[in-house]
Amino acid sequence: MSFNSLKIGKYVIEKPIVQGGMGVGISWDQLAGNVSKEGGLGVISAVGTGYYKNKEYSKKLVSDRPLSEANFYSPEGFDAIIQSAKAIAGDKPLAANILYAINDYGRVVRDACESGIDIIITGAGLPTNMPEFTEGYPDVALVPIVSSAKALKIICKRWKKRYDRVPDAVVVEGPKSGGHQGFTYEQCKLEENQLENIVGPVVEEAALWGDIPVIAAGGVWDKSDIEDMMSRGARGVQMGTRFIGTYECDAHANLKKVLLDAKKEDIQLMSSPVGYPAQGVRTALTEMVEKREGPAIKCISNCVAPCNRGEEAKVVGFCIADRLSDAYEGNLETGLFFSGTNGYRLNEIITVQELLTKLTEGE
């Protein structure tokens, strides 16, 4: 089957493939700009923008790390990434992924709007007040990520009552995605929570609120997966991990190699200071953390609200900002490498254009 374009708000995405937001520094200007340029929707991760271009946009560093959320989520770094991605994408739409759990969420959303982003995607919590922060930017399309029809219903109810609007699209994410999950450990394993079983109910709920396109995410790997999701009522898919296997992906070569070398059994769920389990690759770091021998936790960047200034990091045994940033810098000893459950299937590095051709025309 050939795929129809995907409409999100006023924006038309020629190929209904959204590249998932991946931070720190995995989906920044090069990856997002090129995905949009080639007809998909490129998504810039807002996480850790203070690390962009060797931390040149961080106004204050402590132990060579951006101090506090003001520098970790650097507005100047974020703006530089967005402008660079726009220069690559031309007049094609571009999105930003901004986690609801971060400190300074509202400010970072405003930063994205002021920098001219077209679409904002938000997961890691229920963004019930998201429209509040985009006031004055009516053209910015808003896309929450949910893991159930119930979550979508709560968001739509709240948005309709408070802001007289509903989401422009919704991403429904199953537990095979990389990074943070919308489920507990136990829930991730349940059959009823697998993507193929949650897409249908979310499509039904979305239809009750108008014409809200549903984008399926979490474990989507190839054209047949996309066709399967479309047959269940999705109008697009979101994919993260597979885009790591592209030349344009902003990730360090070492990060790409970790995935290229990973075996199926290396990819696992782990605890995270964000309060949700996260999916990633077993490495030297995960083994150190299990023995409670991980790197010192200093909470320099104060990145996410649920961590409570390092308290949760001490419970789980690592600082997520520092460890994801180490992965961005290619540190194989102390880096944290997120991946979806299919990450072990990555076996080559190709161009974004080649990948989108494989996804839309088959391999």
What do these predicted regions represent?
Residues 1-209:
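Active-site entrance/lid segments in N-terminal catalytic domains of soluble metabolic enzymes
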Residues 18, 177-215, 221-363:
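Conserved active-site-proximal phosphate/metal-binding subdomains
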Residues 26, 220-221:
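Residue-level detector of alpha-helix initiation sites
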Residues 130, 216-217:
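Short, surface-exposed recognition loops or helix-turn segments adjacent to catalytic cores
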